[in-house]
């Protein structure tokens, strides 16, 4: 759409080449079976994802060449919103460091998107395949092959949704958190305070007790309603890696409220095998939101809105029977994350 193409063109992207690659993929996808060596069709790949998900390998784990790593954010939203509903779904795992074969269970399907000439993950992916993990390899000649990948994955997930018996084009659970968040904002405007979002003690022992509920084939999501910074990125990456290595469960990280529009649908609509760790912090700088455009009067701030969204999503998860724990990291986010990770070494 123009929404994405216009900024891309302004950044110097050769939009015609990008779209030409998408047209090529559309031509390939007219066939149910790959028309030649090295060619993947949406029907073929979608059938694989759907079949393996129904067999228990429902954690689609992406390994991406570093130059195309941001593609993971797009495909994560596509898969989670399209398939995570009616008690089923495919859980997308992006940004998780590639580990040794022994840190994975039998619920994974690895998808390796390799940019031509980049062998960064060749050895690690081959080790996973040698250990018996299923691996799908997708080769990109250059970054413009992302145009092909966009079309391929849209068709892939439509087919996978059909195999799972769900409609991949609706999002029935997204509105639940929004409704509750609006109710929290209304209460704040009436009473001057939000309902309490009770937090667990900020200690690794509290996290360990929560994780005692974990079962084989579960997954863990870190819901970080905090300011994104490089230091926070590293602390979250360390925590998720320790969780994965200790429990052998798939992990994901989402900054809130962004993730509500990417993986939020799946969190409430899938089979209920997620453990959700909600992380909040105090706003170091807050900005008032005008009640009406062109006015200076304000009854809430962005900090209040974010807190309401976090509380609304927690209530929506609990209403759906999900397992949730909340930690308030206050103002020192990185130190708080490190404290939680201490007991997971």
Please provide the spans of the model-predicted regions.
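Active-site phosphate/pyrophosphate-binding segments
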Residues: 1-109, 116-119, 142-148, 152-250, ...
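General beta-strand structural signal in soluble alpha/beta enzymes
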Residues: 17-20, 137, 251-255, 326
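Hydrophobic/aromatic beta-strand patches that form the interior of the parallel beta-sheet core
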Residues: 91-93, 109-113, 136-139, 275-277, ...
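A structural-propensity feature for long, helix-poor, extended segments
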Residues: 111-114, 289-318
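Phosphate/diphosphate-binding loops
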Residues: 112-139
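Ligand-binding clefts of soluble mixed alpha/beta catalytic domains
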Residues: 143, 158, 164-167, 281-296, ...
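C-terminal amphipathic alpha-helical interaction region
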Residues: 170, 175, 190, 209-222, ...
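Conserved, well-ordered active-site substructure
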Residues: 259-296
């Amino acid at each position: 759409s123009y929404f994405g193409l216009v900024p891309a063109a302004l950044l110097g992207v050769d939009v015609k080449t990008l779209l030409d690659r998408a047209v090529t993929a559309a031509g390939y996808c007219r066939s149910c079976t790959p028309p030649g060596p090295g060619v993947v069709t949406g029907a073929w790949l979608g059938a694989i994802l759907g079949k393996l998900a129904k067999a228990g390998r429902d954690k689609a784990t992406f390994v991406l060449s570093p130059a195309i790593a941001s593609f993971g954010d797009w495909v994560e939203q596509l898969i989670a919103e399209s398939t995570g509903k009616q008690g089923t779904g495919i859980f997308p795992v992006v940004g998780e460091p590639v580990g040794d074969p022994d840190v994975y269970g039998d619920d994974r399907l690895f998808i390796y998107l390799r940019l031509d000439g980049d062998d960064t993950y060749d050895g690690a992916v081959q080790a996973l395949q040698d250990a018996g993990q299923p691996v799908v390899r997708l080769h990109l000649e250059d970054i413009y092959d992302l145009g092909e990948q966009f079309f391929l994955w849209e068709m892939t997930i439509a087919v996978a949704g059909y195999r799972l018996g769900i409609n991949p084009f609706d999002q029935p659970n997204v509105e639940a958190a929004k409704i509750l968040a609006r109710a929290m904002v209304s209460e704040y405007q009436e009473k001057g305070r939000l309902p309490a979002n009770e937090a667990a003690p900020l200690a690794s022992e509290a996290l360990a007790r929560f994780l005692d509920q974990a079962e084989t084939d579960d997954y863990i999501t870190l819901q970080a309603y905090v300011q994104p910074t490089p230091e926070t990125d590293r602390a979250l990456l360390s925590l998720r890696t320790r969780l994965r290595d200790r429990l052998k469960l798939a992990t994901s990280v989402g900054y809130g409220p962004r993730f509500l529009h990417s993986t939020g649908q799946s969190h409430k609509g899938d089979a209920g095998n997620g453990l959700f760790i909600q992380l909040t912090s105090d706003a170091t700088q807050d900005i008032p939101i005008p009640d009406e455009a062109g006015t200076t009067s304000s009854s809430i701030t962005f900090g209040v809105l974010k807190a309401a969204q976090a509380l609304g999503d927690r209530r929506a998860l609990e209403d759906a029977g999900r397992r949730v724990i909340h930690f308030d990291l206050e103002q020192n986010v990185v130190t708080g994350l490190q404290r939680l990770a201490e007991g997971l070494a």
